[in-house]
Curated annotation (Swiss-Prot):
GO molecular function, one term: rRNA binding
Source organism per UniProt: Acinetobacter baumannii (strain ATCC 17978 / DSM 105126 / CIP 53.77 / LMG 1025 / NCDC KC755 / 5377)
Coiled coil spans: none
Pfam families: tRNA_U5-meth_tr
Keywords: Methyltransferase, S-adenosyl-L-methionine, Transferase, tRNA processing
Cellular component, GO, one term: cytosol
Catalytic activity: uridine(54) in tRNA + S-adenosyl-L-methionine = 5-methyluridine(54) in tRNA + S-adenosyl-L-homocysteine + H(+); uridine(341) in tmRNA + S-adenosyl-L-methionine = 5-methyluridine(341) in tmRNA + S-adenosyl-L-homocysteine + H(+)
Lineage per the UniProt record: Bacteria, Pseudomonadati, Pseudomonadota, Gammaproteobacteria, Moraxellales
Active site residues of this protein: 319, 353
Record-given protein name: tRNA/tmRNA (uracil-C(5))-methyltransferase
Amino acid sequence: MTSSYRQQLQAKIDRITTQFSEFTPPTLEVFESPEQHFRMRAEFRIWHTENDMFYAMFERNDDGKQKTVVRIDEFPIADKSINDLMPLLLAELKANSLLSQRLFEVDFLATLSGEMLVTLIYHRKLNQEWEQAAKALAEKLNIKIMGRSRGQKIVIGDDFVVEEFELLNRSFKYKQIESSFTQPNAQVCKKMLQWACDAAEGSKKHLLELYCGNGNFTLPLSLKFERVLATELAKSSVYAAQWNIEQNQIDNIQVARLSAEEFTQAYQGEREFRRLQEAYIDIQSYDFGTVFVDPPRAGIDDETLKLLQGFERIIYISCNPDTLYENLKTLTQTHRVTKFALFDQFPYTHHVESGVLLEKI
């Protein structure tokens, strides 16, 4: 482990340990990231000069107002497949004005299983000639390509990739849609999935999952429970989760298109939802013992926190230590922290991903 990686990781460990000490958690479990080639997605601006075109990012000056263009020829934190493709793709784009004209952004989405989706974003309308050139490029480089412009989306192949993880003595396939959220650090994601499954060990009754996304945690957790009800509001994520459940031949999961707030209303009988009836979901038929939450950075609203306090076990994955800290002030009134973890999902940044298991006092 290099000193620069160890130093930034230790700073996160110190911050989390100090911030959460008042909740007297057990010893912090630390899950490291690879030091390079850990990001499975990367987004670059395309910078055009009179005689050249290159990948670029912007660096803000100290005052935060001025931005400096930084040329990017390689990107060590991105997966090796992205780094290998970057110069090959750029050379092809430069050689074909149909593909390079008014191109302003290139996004890469890769998988450990070897798939690659490249999104080319333009400041012009894309025509049939562009589509023919993009098809030839996709075939030559063995990638999927998506072209985007205002009001346009042209798909060459698919608008998704399929990731595959080995976990719990089986493989799990995940559809990852181009515009939807996916965990960017696949190696750390696998460690998070394993930790969550370990936290669920010995659980009885059924599992409720809020904010399930594409079913990232839902699939492996389903092996630990008799029945699972997962909720998610974003339609594209719900469709991806349902595809993932079918592809993985798992038959004990139902997905409800509800926000956390809406689930609380339905669970407490305050409101009926046609969406539940149409999906043949009877919330009252579940006997929940454990709830799994992976909320957005804003954390969990007060009503949902009250709901969580009624569960025997809460497994909470957080991408924002500050909102986790605030939420734990409420949850530790009824529960104690029995597992505590740090996942270095975003090395060399201030972002910290953490996990806690809470059990009823």
